[in-house]
Amino acid sequence: MRDANLPIKHWSHSSLMTFLRNPLAWYKRYVEEVYDTPSSPSGVVGRAGHVALQHFYSGIEKNGAVDLGLEYLRNVPDFEINFGKARTRAARKKRRAAMEREYLQAISFYLARPPRHDVFGVEVKGVVEVEGLPLPLKAVSDLVVRSKVDRKAVDIVDHKFVDSFSTLKKDKPIFVIQSIFNYYVVRELFKKPVKRFILHECRKRKNADGSAQMRRYVIDFADYKEEFALFHRLIRDATAEISRPRVYLPNPSDMFEGDNSFDIYRLGLTE
């Protein structure tokens, strides 16, 4: 049973990463539940791509899925986007037009030869208890599909739209941690063995050398037993940290929320 004194009800991948990166930003969003930090244009484009793929893998034909992603992008209000130096109406209009072009190019790269799957679930969400962990885990899986290496099992598929491909590939710690969150939730929801986490990265800008716009990384969970033990340790240690009285400090060097978290600290809004 969850300790009633803990400030949150569960851990998610985004929550844990925010806590490790910027404790004050984490406190604002996941404890106070204030969600007012604007998204970057790149982040909005990526979410539009996810919307398109969600509809495509739900059975809608390509053009219809692309249109629904574009509709999502156009419906995001200006105040939810961090336009940076584009402060005038004309500058923001120009930036939005560039976002639409970037989205249409990126989704065209993905759907030129879309990965084919026997899909069991799209945008699969859940919160589950895990033996040995002090808080439940929450995760959202882009796709849950029949595994091609074991037809009695499932694989988890994740899509990412990126400016550049990941350097550490499948062994990048942030991917491994995300995959374990998804593993536990999907295993509980589908009651089937979970074999792999498959990550498809799509580079949004056209490669000058003509190389492939898509890269595929595969995490076979059978090869990551040590990482599961490390994950459990990290969740327990992070939970211990938030269970004690503490001051939540900002991280001004955080490229995502450094300025905002420092402004909150300056104003003493969490005291």
What do the PLM-derived regions correspond to, one by one?
Residues H10, D36, S40, K169-P173:
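Short, solvent-exposed segments of well-ordered alpha helices
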Residues M1-I8, P23-D36, A86, I156, ...:
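Short amphipathic alpha-helical segments and their helix-coil junctions
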Residues Y184-E271:
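Metal-dependent nuclease catalytic regions and adjoining charged, substrate-binding loops involved
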Residues A52-K125:
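A non-catalytic, helix-rich entry segment at domain boundaries
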Residues G121-S179, Y184-V186:
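Non-catalytic protein-protein interaction segments used by genome-maintenance enzymes to assemble
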Residues D3-R21, L135-R151:
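An acidic intrinsically disordered interaction segment
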Residues M17-K62, E100:
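Nuclease catalytic cores
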Residues N63, V130-P134, K148-A153, F190-P193, ...:
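Short, solvent-exposed loop/turn segments that connect beta-strands within catalytic domains
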